[in-house]
Regions:
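Conserved inter-motif catalytic segment of the P-loop NTP-binding fold
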Residues: 1-40, 48, 55, 129-130, ...
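Phosphate-binding/switch region of NTP-binding enzymes
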Residues: 25, 44-134
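Alpha-helix initiation/capping motif
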Residues: 41-42, 71, 148, 152
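Short amphipathic alpha-helical interface segments
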Residues: 143-158
């Protein structure tokens, strides 16, 4: 089990990367389990936790993905739905939000934003047989390209 920020998580990550030198990615599920408990300003605490993990990632030249939950309340901006303060989204290099309107449903929207990436949104459908999210629409691609892909798939099928 992972330690929390300020209580051993840095050493755990460093030791793991030392024992597995080809490590490029660490996934922490969930961020809440390793957060510091603080009576400080909530924004400052959130930003400090993210900055701490970012400094470890930069030092070890790895990516750290934090799994975190969304608020139940709706908002036009998916980043505003991330639970906690904007210190979480503001401190990270990139943010990804998977929004599933219905837990049991197969449809979702995936939003990406960050310092070094273009903003992007995708409509997805979860294939329960293959266990893979299929891209239905992608803001990064022009509709013509998607239409060509769909047409090519239909022609190939026929």
């Amino acid at each position: 089990m992972a330690e929390s920020i300020g209580y051993g998580i840095e050493e755990q990550i460093e030791n793991f990367c030392s024992n597995h030198p080809n490590t490029k990615l660490i996934v922490i599920d969930t961020f809440q389990k390793i957060r510091t408990i603080s009576n400080d300003n909530a924004y400052a605490s959130d930003y400090r936790d993210i900055s701490f993990l970012k400094s470890i990632a930069d030092k070890l030249k790895i990516a750290i993905v934090l799994i975190h939950h969304l608020r139940k309340q709706k908002d036009d901006d998916p980043m505003n739905r991330v639970s906690g303060t904007t210190g979480i989204t503001g401190g990270a290099d990139s943010n990804f939000v998977l929004d599933r309107p219905k837990r049991e449903g197969t449809r979702a929207k995936f939003f990406c934003t960050g310092r070094d990436i273009e903003d992007r949104s995708m409509e997805l459908n979860f294939n329960r047989t293959s266990k893979i999210w299929d891209v239905i629409a992608d803001s990064y691609e022009t509709p013509e390209i998607l239409l060509e892909d769909i047409t090519a798939t239909v022609v190939k099928f026929l």
